[in-house]
Amino acid sequence: PIAGSMVLAAILLKLGGYGIIRMMQILPTTKTDMFLPFVVLALWGAILANLTCLQQTDLKSLIAYSSISHMGLVVAAIIIQTPWGLSGAMALMIAHGFTSSALFCLANTTYERTHTRILILTRGLHNILPMATTWWLLTNLMNIAVPPTMNFTGELLIMSALFNWCPTTIIMLGLSMLITASYSLHMFLSTQMGPTLLNNQTEPTHSREHLLMILHLIPLMMISMKPELVI
């Protein structure tokens, strides 16, 4: 069910990150040699989740693995125990909570009309649902973390903190973000572009669906303008 997916991605997955923040407070202060294997493991996990996203054919599976890959960055940022790392982790958790929930909502909008979640079978929707295509584009851009969204703020803080802590981590971070951009654009092009395969009549998007998307995306824009609310 769509509500379960949205709550799972937006809240329950982030509770794990919050638990790690609490647990790190009782551990000894950070030493590069001690925590480096865990940071590398978290970033490697993020890269593997991103690569898994690239080979997904199911829309909901792709979005779910996307959430897991972002949590890899969050865990790496929490482990190093720096103020910038913790701020970036908190910002990215909140931002990606909104983004992944919005993506699941859009996936359900597509599923209700096509009755399939296979990427290649849902293509050509920009001709039928142009407004939904706009929402897909905006949400994917937020998933990639373009400014001025909260995702950008979070990823910038995490990149700065990790690079300052250990410069070689930038290789894995850069690779992870490159693959994130690749699968996000792949998801957008697969679902929206090309000739449509639908023969039956498709109902237009409802005001309820547009309101849902507005309520997801507006907070992301607003919080990025005043990040003190969450950081």
Curated annotation (Swiss-Prot):
A single GO molecular function term of this UniProt record: ubiquinone binding
GO cellular component assignments: mitochondrial membrane
Membrane topology label: Multi-pass membrane protein
E.C. numbers: 7.1.1.2
Catalytic activity from the UniProt record: a ubiquinone + NADH + 5 H(+)(in) = a ubiquinol + NAD(+) + 4 H(+)(out)
Chief localization: mitochondrion
Top-level taxon: Eukaryota
Pfam family, one: Proton_antipo_M
UniProt record similarity statement: Belongs to the complex I subunit 4 family.
Name of the protein in question: NADH-ubiquinone oxidoreductase chain 4
Naturally occurring in which organism (per UniProt): Agkistrodon contortrix contortrix
Name of the coding gene: MT-ND4
